[in-house]
């Protein structure tokens, strides 16, 4: 390595990332760094701030944070790897990717990670040190090479990669073992691949992930923030052997991409277990028998079952021998069986027995809590520090991160540090006295948000340990000063913050100087007087600059407008139980699914249906095959028991039947007279036209169907089911191509939970922010609650236009 002894006269230094400066940064909303080396600057945009960071010479700028309401930019030498991250309002943290990454691109010229040992384990010498070796590359002479501490670097563009001088007097320098970043190649099965290849192995152009044309799909980027579903780049969000994409060819739904394997060893896979933790992706035990006692087939063999879950396709999943494993993100470890009649089964793995203290702050797999956000609106008193409800959804609809988890956001708001705050599960809480309950989110790019909760009016009771949950008071409808959604269109006269501080006039510059939110710069925002407004569309609602010199801005406490009853669909007045079982499952709380109806012939229940307006019920077309005369049918609304009907049920005749004209399994029934909308009889919401339910969304089915002898026969039962993307559901192992794009799958692949005979035509509803949406009509399945055979439902969003046309014209 003689050239390292030479003073290089010229280096071709290419900055990573050209064009938009922000492409080189990772962003996190609501995050701030506790930095000791920083500069505060006044700028008008995040792009300006990025330029300032790039041009800084007095220190290496690794991050910056931007405060939009202050128009303030803070550039910093630290990042989240070197200093604590704090929760803060009105701030976005931007961190340079190159300083967060512990992998190298190409030869590692721009590697800025923290590896400080060589391949043989020798400790690196500091670049600024003179002993034991006098360096030719020093921080002073090479300020752009990132020669920090004793970290491995490649200041001379060595093709063999990063290196360092060593602390061994006998060894002047050695190369370091730095893994390759997965933007030019892939490790394992490519689930962390973040490159920009956007064509399939046959050369087809990839369809953008945020598009539903030409192929509708459930891999929606906003629902999978950790999967990096950007642009139309090849990705692997569902555990396939390698990255893939939907294609722009209407005749080819999806195809694998040709991504080369990285030549360096893969990154550590994290802790492994001899017992079941989470979904068992890290299980490395030696159980080799399925739940029914069948012996497992060896992963490397193709007999009796041919498959692609091979050690070659999943090199990081330890597919040794015939041991049960979970290489592709199934609910639990499984294996192919040696029985030619049974392709595969799950295995029975003992649960890990460990105390919470052993796992809660580790990077162990996180068990995501079940959906708990109540649809019956809870409220909180004061600033919500006494709130003890079960809401776990933020104001923008994001799911909350469990308080004991450090993924995706590391934090100090733990049950140990705040023992009196009741930091249970992932429920919204207010441990630090903020303006209302909040939580960390499961979106890596959004650290925290306030929760989708209302403040109690004077007559309401909050969700506390001693008080029952109450429905938001109807008296709120008399409020004249109220907001819709985030209040961007609010034009009321509220002029004090939630803390009671008077607002500063928008045209004033005292006590706070500002230029971005003034009547002149925002003429359409109606910035009159000192009234609360939301000119920037802040998710937390209207705000104002305050007259307190120590408080730049704060939010205003303005109630939400009460929706008219016609817009109140999908909101039962009794909170659903939301249990995870149907066949062998649980009995629903009476009238908690008030849109569920019973279709009857000759007094007998035979199918379910869903009330979508006072005069109209949606059901399955196959339920109406035997008799075309609508007078044969009766619709029972508000029932909980199948046979012993309550006195206040409504029984309606059917005057008209409408079958979908292209023979889809969906139909509309017009009732003989409008149903009276009550707490027990209430319509579900229709989805937006062509809306796609995201893969793994938790939805609910209800019905009086066959229960296989389980408890609750004759009573309305419910089940929680995950939606399964059609691409997955149509695998050979499951429904083998039978599911059409106008249908959706939902169910537990382990079996035991499903809709069944008598449930046909009934609803599959999915919770969205604050209400239930009718996304599916129970249609068909291969058997009932069978292993690897999920239920199939008509995708209602594909027929919304037809449904609305029929109702409008009849």
Curated annotation (Swiss-Prot):
Instruction: Name the chain's protein.
Output: Plasminogen
Q: Where is this region: Disordered?
A: 398-418
| Residue ranges of domain Kringle in the record | 103-181, 185-262, 275-352, 379-456, 482-561
In this UniProt entry, the residues modified to Phosphoserine are 598
Where's the Peptidase S1 domain?
582-808
**Coiled coil (UniProt feature):** none
Gene Ontology BP, a term = proteolysis
Provide the activity regulation entry from the record: Converted into plasmin by plasminogen activators, both plasminogen and its activator being bound to fibrin. Cannot be activated with streptokinase.
Lineage runs: Eukaryota, Metazoa, Chordata, Craniata, Vertebrata
- What's the Enzyme Commission number for this chain? 3.4.21.7
Cytoplasm listed as a keyword: no
Q: Name one Pfam family in it.
A: Kringle
Glycosylation sites (chain numbering): 339
> Its principal location?
secreted
